[in-house]
Amino acid sequence: MSLEKLLNREENDSSKRTDFMGRWYLKMSKICERDDREMDYQNWKFLSYQEFELINEWNQQGKELTKDNCERLLVNMDKTHKEWVEYQKFKEQKDAIIAELKESIQIIKQEPSIPSGADANSVVSSDTEQIQDSETTANSKKSPAINGIKTSGKSPTKSPATNGRRRGAGGNRRVKRPSNLSKTVRSRNATDGDENGNENIENGGTTPKRRSRPKKILVSNVSKDVDAEEEDDIHTEKDASGSAADLDKDIVDESINDSENAPRKRPVSSTSLLSRNKSNKPTKSSPLTPDSAREKENVNGVTEGNEDMDHDSVLDADDSAIGSDDNPNDEQEEADDENVDEEAEDENDEAEVEDDIDDLGAPEDDGDDDFAPSYSAISKVKVNKKVNIDSPMPAIQKELRKMAIKSSVAKAMKRKFTNCKVISYSPESQLEIKITLKQLHIRKYKRHLAEEERKRKAEEALIKAEEEAKKRKLAPPPPPPPQQVRRVEHDLPTYGMKITLKEARAIQRHYDQTYITIWKDMARRDSGRISRQLQQIQSIRGQNFRKTSSLCAKEARRWQMRNFRQVKDFQTRARRGIREMSSFWKKNEREEREMKKKAEKEAIEQAKKEEEQRENLRAAKKLNFLLTQTELYSHFIGSKIKTNELEGTMTDDSLTSMSNNKNKVVDLTKTAASKTNVESIDFATEDDEKLRLMAAQNASNALKETQDKARKFDEEDEEDGELNFQNPTSLGEITIDQPKMLACTLKEYQLKGLNWLANLYDQGINGILADEMGLGKTVQSISVLAHLADRYNIWGPFIVVTPASTLHNWVNEISRFVPQFKILPYWGNANDRKTLRKFWDRKHLRYGRDAPFHVMVTSYQMVVSDASYLQKMKWQYMILDEAQAIKSSQSSRWKTLLSFHCRNRLLLTGTPIQNNMQELWALLHFIMPSLFDSHDEFSDWFSKDIESHAESNTELNQEQLRRLHMVLKPFMLRRIKKNVQSELGDKIEIDVLCDLTFRQAKLYQVLKSQVSGGYDAIENAAGNDDVTSDQKLVNLVMEFRKVCNHPDLFERADVMSPFSFVSFGESASLSREGDFVEVNYSAKNLINYNLPRLIYDELVVPNYNNDVDVRAKLLYHTMNIFHPANSFQLCFILSKLTDTSPNKFATLLEQNVINRAIDLQNDGYFNTAKYSIAYDEGEKIFSSNLLINDKLKYLHLLKNSTSGSVLKNLLEIPSSVYENEYFNSISPAYHPAASAPPINIDVLASNNFVQKKQYEMFNPSISSALSSIPSSVQHKLIVEKGIPIEELPVTEMAPKAFNNSFTSYIEMPSMDRFITESAKLKKLDELLVKLKEEDHRVLIYFQMTKMMDLMEEYLTYRQYTHIRLDGSSKLDDRRDLVHDWQTKPDIFIFLLSTRAGGLGINLTAADTVIFYDSDWNPTIDSQAMDRAHRLGQTRQVTVYRLLIRGTIEERMRDRAKQKEHVQQVVMEGKAKENKQKIIEVEKEHSESA
């Protein structure tokens, strides 16, 4: 059994205590962290608020700052400085005192340890006296002026016992604990180590009474005074080998800590502490425990003096009364004592938790008294100092030393609980303890002895039973020692009685029911009460938390308000001073910074200027070096192939003269070939002559590499064993005649081009044939292939790569000009191309006249997709038609074709420059990679100067332009039409400017208002290339272009029709019917009206009750003069005149108007007379009277009798012209919102009404007379059935509508409005009428296929014959469309897409080109218009370009002109005058909305 169990209470389970402490530690750690964060936030908030107020006040005071105020401010600043100096002195004094204390501590530590057998009490007393002396010295050195150190002026009256105790304590001074600490202040009991009590014994003094001090001390808001000795309660952890000196060291350290905090402490008299402690009565929140009661008794013992003896006598009496074993209430008292012990242990646990919380306290704030804990919070803290056998040795020694000091007191108070005295103690040899057990501990000890005795007896019985079982070789189960063995029968207890099975079962059932009833009562009665108690505890706890937090917040606010008022004036002055000083220093720093930046900027600009000068000089030398090497190479090649002579007189004379005046040219054949890297040359130090020599060596090396490459290609072919004449013996000048196998006659300039191409092939150099479109680049390239086959017996393989639209054109041209060539058309799907690849064998095939193919014609798409197959072939010659397709050096086409293995490459393009100089460099690098290897250098040479000249009309460097022409001449041949074709006249270009219509202007304005970036950015995007502009801006440009073309590109006009309030009948499946289906009248109104039978019978149907029949008789019989019964003589006369019998008169009177008209048309004599006139059959009828027939009159009556209205059209020519010109243009001014058939009327249970209604609505004779009979039915009646014409039923008697617009309520969109809503379409409509009259044929180019759809509707409305070609047209369809246009002159208009129909096709049948909208690239439009303006054109070509004034199209046109100017400068060397004619269409103010 542990020492703690014997001295105090039983120890709880260690595992439960560990879990409990861990949970509380985590919970309180979170609370402390939250409190720290909240405290930091409040401090930051208050300091920020103070700083803000301080700056505001300084700003306000700065406005009113005068001379007096400035002097006053300086005085205050001096005063503050002096205070700060005094504070520094005080701090230095404090540090000196602490240093002295530490020196004294070091002296104490250096003393020898306590020897064995020495008196521990004397050592402790001497140490305590030294510490007290040091404290007294430290307190005496401190200045009394320092705040926080106050001595007690008066000493309260004390009892003799108290005075004696204070004298026995050696005059200990009480030191104040720091006020900002939030830890609970704890005090020791009188029995917890009064080290000074031993001093009186040694001095022979009387034994003092047990010293009692309150355990909880209330710390006031002003000052918190505690005894310095209370710091000894701090827990210390020492090693097991520690000695008594370690304990003294702990006490000294605690004293030092108290001395360091001395400026914030003041002593408090013991009387004030006692009186404060008396007021702390136990409450509900802090119940009175045995420890607290004992402390209460100790405190009372200090003031009451001799009352302790009476109290002890009472306790002894109680002990004697309780200690008797015969007391019947012992068990109840033991249970109560156990409850008391458990409560005390719980309180000790709570005290330990609170001690841990104190260790995790929030950061301390000096001078912050407002947040000091209240007494209620402090009173809950319990001191827990438990020492057991397992505790460290220093703690056990300390506890034993305290016990020894207590035992030295002569008379100890009798206690209710266990008392322990240490009789003698030696740390190494002896420990003698006298323990007096009383009350609870005696009973527990007795129970413990009885339990041990029972266990011993049980173990002995078990051992004895096991021994007996071993003897009998049986192992009976050990009997349970504490339980009573009951006799059991039939698995039921008998309770020591003889009972039957039935009785036992009844007793067991009664027991079970009683057991269950007890548990039910407990669950029903106690569970709710426990739950309510738990909820009540939680609610009370929450209320306490809320109250505490509200009080804390209230105290914090009160503290802030108080401090705010005190510092307000100081903040105002400080703010003004800060503002003035900050403004002054900011201004000063800004001026210095500006001066420094200015100086740095000037230095940087000067350095940059010098660097630019050096770089310009270096770049000029580098440019001169590169150009010199290129010019030498170009001059050498040009002298061999004579490009200048072939081009004719198209170049500028000034450039030619400047070229003639050039310095002497170096002969590359005599110059050593060596390559010098440009990056390794230092252009700043090398001289010009050396650079010129290195340039000549590089040019010679490039020439040698080119020739070696061609020679190597030829040698590889020779190694294959093919016998041909591919290697000419010399490189001399060759004059070539037209090849014999060429089935055409070349013109003079085309023959010159053939010579140039042949010379290029002989030199092994690639070239660009850039003749203007329409000069026969195709036939020249075909002629050079024929030349190779005719002269050198080189039959291939040749490859021609062309756009998809010209594939068939190339096949046709090669077949027509060189029939001996076998052509392989390589296009189609994957399976078709796989079959075509069987025509060549890359290993053993020799290309001669009998080869499977000579020329392969394919497209750029096929080259990219089947590059893996085509790259393995060794092509003799590659021709790229429309080479602007590889204008981008980053495209896959360019990279794939560059990797092909071929001897020579020829590029065919009419526009080598479309947008910028980069495209020209891509073509040059493709044919000569060794010379034109850097685009950046090429751009520095030419691009920037020429493009800036075209854009801003700056001065052009003629020397640079001359050098560009010198570089390009050997590789490019270009002729224009006016220099080589005198029979082909210049085309006329006309820009037609139109104004926006009202609807277009509104849409354009709406789009401009919705653009966020501004309309100027849109116009800039329209002026730039589509590949370089922002894609979003390009999309907006397209929207504006749609408005300019036609508003219906956004939204088409809808077909309008009224709401049909009708139900239609549903028919069966029409698949089983014939060509014609009879459909009955099935349209019915959704409204049905039931006419009452009585009304119908009495008012409508004649009978005896009404006079309907009588009135009809009077109207149609009695009062009718034409009735035979009334006037027979008149009827007889009329019958003679009209050839009508009286009976017929009577019949006609009974009929309605429709039946009369039908009978008149069906009259046999009348029809016979009509048809005899119509069909020239003569008079075949007999008449007793003379009848004069007016043939013209009868012809008008017969106009509806012929099928197809042939006779009607012949008879109504004047009226039809009048109607077409005037009446057909009239449209209804009103369109009903709804339409419906008549309301259905029914009479219930009346068959007469149903029959009459059916007869009136569906009379066959009336229906056939009002409608027309189809032609097929008429043919069947006359031819197949043989019915005479005169017996055919009468038809088309219904009156016709005013015009087609009045035939139906359905309103179709007006085509006239469709035309007038677009300014371009309106102008085009007028232009086409003029061109149709003058017998022109027109090509109309579009950028948008949707606009082509609208144009087809317009052409259909105007009945113009037209065909269409766009990107969706197949290759076969394109060939057929071009053939139809060239061979069928009745086709008036050809609609084409600029991208699809502007490349490589011949449309010379047209003499007029109209651009409905222009392309971004002007060369695309040039190629499109040259489809008609080319060889074979015999008529004057006119080009119209439709533009909208003041819109984005004008900006695009200006940019296109700049690009054209770049082409003119590069190709021709000078700007060409603009010969375009501009026609402005004046704005019509009468345009319809």
Curated annotation (Swiss-Prot):
UniProt domain Helicase ATP-binding: residue ranges? 758-930
User: In what ranges is there compositional bias, type Polar residues?
Assistant: 122-142, 149-162, 179-190, 268-289
Share an example GO biological-process annotation for this protein: DNA repair
Ranges of residues in domain DBINO: 518-643
Main localization of the protein described in the UniProt heading: nucleus
As its record notes, the protein acts as a catalyst of: ATP + H2O = ADP + phosphate + H(+)
Task: Give the EC number(s) listed in the UniProt record.
Answer: 3.6.4.-
User: Which GO cellular component does the record give, naming just one?
Assistant: Ino80 complex
Per its database record, what is this protein's job? ATPase component of the INO80 complex which remodels chromatin by shifting nucleosomes and is involved in DNA repair.
> Assembly and interactions?
Component of the INO80 chromatin-remodeling complex.
User: Which protein, by its recorded name, is this?
Assistant: Chromatin-remodeling ATPase INO80
Record organism: Kluyveromyces lactis (strain ATCC 8585 / CBS 2359 / DSM 70799 / NBRC 1267 / NRRL Y-1140 / WM37)
